[in-house]
Amino acid sequence: MMMPAEELEALARAEPVVHDEADGRRRRGNATRESILQAAADLASVEGLEGLTIGRLATELEMSKSGLFAHFGSKEELQLATIDAARRRFVEHVVKPSRSLPRGRERLEALINDWLAYFRSEQFDGGCFFHTVKAEFDSRPDNAVREVVMEDVRQFLGLLSREVRKAQEAGDLDPTVDPEQLAFELDALGTAVNSGWQLHEDSAVFDRGRRAIARRLEVEATEAGRAALAAAAP
């Protein structure tokens, strides 16, 4: 069974599917669905997932409810599909770019820097989609939508932990450091950057966040890791 963090990496490695002309109608239908889901994710990033209904989205897109029902049979199905679309956008902008780098501290830092850049680029109208829905569902009763949201949060934390381990295996970070603890601290720093940006629109938080993260990693770096990072610097 694939571990959660590996699912994010698998998405990042996935190649686009090539269709022949016989699939033209299906491709057009998929393109329409993707456009709807992009709008749904933007709307949910502002208003939350609970307010995302077939009727609300139909009003936003100036479409008929029956037209949306052709793509999504229920509110829950729409919500789950919206989370999936947001996840794919997150993987494309945050997880995928650093996959070509060798395992180690450089790749870990690149992953985190891409995460911070994703916050700043505001891929969604309301800022980070997952920051919004995580806060929304934090105290909600368990249901299918909440479980998927919480699993996505766990996946990214797991990915950070895996990258810390790989940096340890590469000799860049102290092997006695607890990967889960360091991943937790890195996640907390990144989340603080996003909160500062969303609440105060203070761009200085990005530089502060990068410096804080770099210092935290420097504390746990090995001498060999410091030398390798210095050699790789432009």
List each model region and its residues.
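C-terminal peripheral helix-coil segments that are non-catalytic and often amphipathic
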Residues: M1-D23, A110-A117, R154-A170, E180, ...
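Basic, helix-initiating cap at the start of DNA-binding domains
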Residues: M1-E47, G51-E60, E77-L80
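An amphipathic alpha-helix adjacent to DNA-recognition modules
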Residues: N30-Q38, S45, E50-G51, E62, ...
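Key DNA-contact positions within bacterial/archaeal DNA-binding proteins
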Residues: S66
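Hydrophobic alpha-helical connector segments
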Residues: A81, V95-G126, P179-L186, G225-A232
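Short, solvent-exposed amphipathic helices
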Residues: R89, D125, A144-Q155, R162
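Amphipathic alpha-helical segments used for helix-helix packing
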Residues: R107, E122-A144
